């Protein structure tokens, strides 16, 4: 027995009705980490908190199974930086508040920019942008224009280019900013038109969890990772087994320990984030889930027939026993009458 065995309690609580011993935990951790031997970042490890409490920590696989649409937040906790094309101080409010993406909408206009700003912006464009521009607009000549009218025309052409390129560059900047502040769901990040959507069923994500985090805390962690506005109370965690059984985790469950109990293989069991009112599927019903509807109907018909036959058998037995009892009562009553006489 090691010194760590003396420090930590002998039993680890999984939920209000389930606990595992230290020996079981060590075995489960060893099995899990051997399974992911070549993926060290997926290992689940244990240590202790400052107050000496045992804690298990690692990455928890969670699969999307929600049916109700989810709402992505319109903004992140950090202020969004200006996009490359219009990065002048006047672009943003002087107040130190959070910038909403919608505030960029009024930037699609032609403002009076001097020639220096125009040339500086062109120097930052990629060769593809340069070719795209010069395929539709006349390039600048090496020498200065011969008349102010020509200079004004060329300047406006560059400004038109700036306005035409702004939406694409804005989109690139917006996607870049988002990647620094939120995780994407299957490549989906916030968009005004698709901010409300439903993730693909069975798509996988990961969240860092520990043995102190109960079910609701893990849900909050997941929603925070993707900046989802929906309340954690709208969702629940379910374990879906390879047999088809679907069981809802209790509020007192520790999802990370439940993952350890089911083993590392995702083919045996997976943890899903689902709507809180999703139905549970018992172990007895689970084997029939994947059968064809017509086959299930034939099974029900067979069960109905067997039920009717069983009812008829019981009724026949009841009538036989009832007749026998009545006959006995009648014979005893007749014997009593004869004795009295």
Swiss-Prot record:
Pfam families named in the record: Nore1-SARAH, RA
Q: Which UniProt keywords apply?
A: Apoptosis, Phosphoprotein
Q: List the disulfide bonds.
A: none
Keyword Phosphoprotein in the entry? The reply is yes
All copies of the Ras-associating domain together span 190-278
Write down the superkingdom of origin: Eukaryota
SMART domains per the record? RA
> What PROSITE patterns has UniProt attached to this entry?
RA (PS50200), SARAH (PS50951)
User: Which SUPFAM superfamilies did the record assign?
Assistant: Ubiquitin-like
Residue limits of the SARAH domain? Answer: 285-332
Q: Could you tell me the Gene Ontology terms of the biological process aspect for this record?
A: apoptotic process; positive regulation of apoptotic process; regulation of apoptotic process; signal transduction
* InterPro entries referenced in this protein's UniProt entry, alphabetically: RA_dom, RASSF1-6, SARAH_dom, SARAH_RASSF6, Ubiquitin-like_domsf
List, alphabetically, the PANTHER family matched. RAS ASSOCIATION DOMAIN-CONTAINING PROTEIN 6 (PTHR22738:SF3), RASSF (PTHR22738)
Summary of subunit composition and partner proteins: Interacts with MOAP1. Interaction with activated KRAS is still a matter of debate: interaction has been shown in the mouse, but not in human. Lack of interaction with MRAS, NRAS nor RRAS2 has also been reported.
> What is the purpose of this protein?
Involved in the induction of apoptosis. May act as a Ras effector protein. May suppress the serum-induced basal levels of NF-kappa-B.
Protein's recorded name = Ras association domain-containing protein 6
Species annotation: Mus musculus
Gene name for this UniProt entry: Rassf6
